[in-house]
Amino acid sequence: PWLIDGKMMSEAGVNTIRLYKSSDNHNGLKKAIGDFYEKYGIRTALGHWLGFWEYPQPFYADPEFRERIKKEVLEMVKTYKDEKGILFWILGNENNYSFSGRVNPWVCPEADKAEVSEQANIRAKIYYSFVNEIAREIHKIDPNHPVVLGNGELGYLDVAAKFCPDIDIVGILIYRGKTFGNIFNGLKSIFDKPLLLVEFGADSYNSFKKAEDEEMQSFFLEAQWKEIYKNSGFAKDGAGNCLGGFIFEWSDEWWKHNSDNSLNWKVHDTEAGWSQGAYYFDNKAEKNLNMNEEWFGIVGISEDKENGVNKRLPRKAYYMLKKMWESSSSK
């Protein structure tokens, strides 16, 4: 299936994809990375969640946990560092949301003994110091590919600036609707590293109208991408620190709303999972729930198959981005 996707991506002007994690099938993944690069000129950013989505929750204060995760990451780097298609490594995703207990809270004796107001910063110090250890080790075995810190918004990056200086790029996950707001200059003021938007986007389902809305998705993605250009090193009037971004996402994920029930994976669920008022086309939906995890693709998926693979259905956003990227590459 990656050959089908790779061809469509190449035709649209995609130059890099993000893989959130490695695979146990090393040869299969190497072939996919190689095919994307050799056939379509598309590079790969390969990541590791650093145990964030494991069960039980991650335990970044535990030496055994840290050693196991570090070993996994370094094995990944050793395995894939010589693949021509590799562009860089991404460490973590939105792990900083665990510091306050918002997502996947973890036990930390040092933090638990401290004042409540200091606990999150102590966890941040422990986590970012751990990421820095890994980044240093990666640079020793692979000096050719940058290391990216994956972080939810700007949260705790003032702590990262002190304890994680060896990362090369700050990767931001952000969902703020039409504009990224202060993200570019905000990063400059607290952690002056190049910025990469490692996850952003807009879904294509209008929860208020209860219908697919390609116009809505295309509107937000166009505005977002224009801000990326404005704040790149090539522009004159922006922050000049943005390297680019990874749109979330290429194709819809039908399994995501109820991932524990495999029978539901064949159903394209339209129930929104969370709320973000900045996506204002449908923020008046019931309970303001307007973010639909199964509808973020710029390419839809059909139940019909062609050569054993579900047909890809490009949305308006796909063609809008194709036109925008073609215009940019010609300048």
Where on the chain are the PLM-derived regions?
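Active-site mouth of glycoside hydrolases
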Residues: 1-174, 179-180, 188-190
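Long, contiguous hydrophobic alpha-helical segments, chiefly transmembrane helices and signal peptides
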Residues: 9, 14-20, 44-49, 147-151, ...
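A structural motif corresponding to the C-terminal end of an alpha-helix
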Residues: 11-13, 79-85, 130-145, 227-242, ...
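Active-site clefts of carbohydrate-active enzymes
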Residues: 52-58, 100-101, 110-113, 191-232, ...
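Alpha-solenoid helical-repeat scaffolds
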Residues: 63, 121, 211, 308-311
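Short, conserved catalytic or adaptor-binding loops enriched in Gly and charged residues
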Residues: 163, 238, 290
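Aromatic-rich peripheral "rim/lid" segments of glycoside hydrolase catalytic domains that contact
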Residues: 241, 248-331
